[in-house]
């Protein structure tokens, strides 16, 4: 399985976070807790690295599901961290009304805007995400100031860049950035994250409909291609399925030059079509990937390059963990 030694991985992440804070001369940290697996793992790591009393953890609901709030409470209790619970729904609604008033006053066609937003829930979803970031910063300052840690993992951040640039992407570090979603799940089991969080469907909960809006369904709707996460058995901590996003990451690692663009790795040249590319990178099918996956990956990577933030440290690299024998790039044979 990709994580060969979960205890060593926990030690590595805890010590690296602790060293980063020590070098910066900053004792405290702030984390936005969503009730999902990534923020749960980060909260457990921060509590171990810095001590529970040095972590400002915030759950900001914007007409969010009760299930996500319950899960946030569960992991805060498990980590021994006090959880700040805020309801930003009224503020969110007020901003929407004021924005519509401003469009109307400026002479825009508000009927068009209403119709457009009815067909694209991500418009309001982007405000939900970006509204939480300044609130998190404010809570951070109110509690004495600290490092604002992110929760992005490799499957979301590497080439999909499945995050909001001014929202969940507006952080100081991403200590999970080198780990796949499956590896984050394995880390969660080892950290004793509550099972309810490990088995919950990954969702950004940005549309106000709970798990009806989940990561995989949004990716499928946007691309027409089944981009999926890996799953693990919480009892054995072993993979029960390998997601196509993780497969793509390991396929990219298998290519000769991992520092060039994904387009050059997959296609050899920007103008090359999918059929030719599939021949060039023919062993993609050995990773369970299709021509459609290659075409979709190129489209996603092209359209999200503006989000990339190379200055946001991941506090280490995947290669360092590979060299230490803590993880492996070899996918489970299922």
Please describe what each predicted stretch is.
Residues 48:
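Primarily recognizes the serine-hydrolase "nucleophile elbow" in alpha/beta-hydrolase
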Residues 100:
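Acceptor/aglycone-binding surface of glycosyltransferases and processive sugar-polymer synthases
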Residues 39-43, 66-73:
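Short, surface-exposed alpha-helical segments at coil->helix boundaries
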Residues 1-31, 45, 53-56, 63-64, ...:
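ATP/NTP-dependent adenylation/nucleotidyl-transfer catalytic domains that generate, transfer
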Residues 133:
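Internal glycine-rich, Lys/Arg-flanked active-site/core loops of soluble domains
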Residues 36:
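Conserved G/P- and acidic residue-centered "switch" motifs that form tight phosphate/ATP-binding loops
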């Amino acid at each position: 399985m990709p994580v060969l030694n979960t205890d060593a991985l926990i030690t590595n992440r805890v010590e690296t976070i602790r060293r980063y804070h020590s070098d910066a001369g900053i004792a405290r940290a702030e984390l936005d807790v969503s009730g999902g697996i990534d923020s749960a793992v980060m909260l457990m790591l921060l509590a171990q690295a810095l001590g529970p009393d040095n972590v400002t953890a915030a759950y900001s609901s914007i007409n969010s599901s009760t299930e996500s709030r319950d899960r946030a409470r569960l992991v805060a209790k498990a980590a021994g961290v006090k959880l700040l619970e805020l309801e930003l729904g009224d503020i969110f609604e007020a901003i929407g009304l004021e924005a519509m008033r401003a469009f109307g006053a400026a002479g825009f066609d508000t009927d068009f805007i209403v119709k457009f937003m009815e067909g694209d829930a991500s418009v309001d979803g982007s405000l939900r995400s970006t509204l939480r970031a300044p609130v998190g910063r404010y809570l951070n300052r109110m509690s004495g100031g600290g490092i604002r840690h992110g929760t992005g993992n490799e499957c979301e951040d590497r080439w999909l860049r499945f995050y909001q640039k001014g929202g969940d992407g507006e952080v100081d570090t991403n200590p999970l950035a080198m780990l796949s979603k499956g590896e984050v799940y394995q880390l969660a089991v080892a950290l004793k994250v509550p099972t309810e969080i490990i088995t919950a469907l990954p969702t950004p909960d940005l549309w106000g409909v709970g798990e009806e809006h989940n990561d995989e369904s949004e990716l499928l709707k946007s691309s027409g291609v089944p981009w999926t996460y890996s799953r693990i058995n919480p009892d054995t901590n072993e993979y029960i399925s390998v997601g196509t996003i993780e497969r793509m990451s390991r396929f990219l690692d298998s290519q000769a030059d991992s520092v060039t663009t994904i387009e050059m790795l997959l296609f050899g040249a920007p103008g090359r079509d999918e059929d030719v590319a599939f021949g060039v990178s023919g062993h993609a099918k050995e990773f369970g990937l299709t021509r459609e996956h290659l075409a979709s990956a190129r489209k996603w990577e092209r359209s999200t390059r503006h989000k990339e933030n190379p200055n946001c440290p991941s506090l280490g690299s995947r290669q360092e963990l590979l060299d230490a024998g803590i993880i492996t790039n070899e996918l489970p044979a299922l």
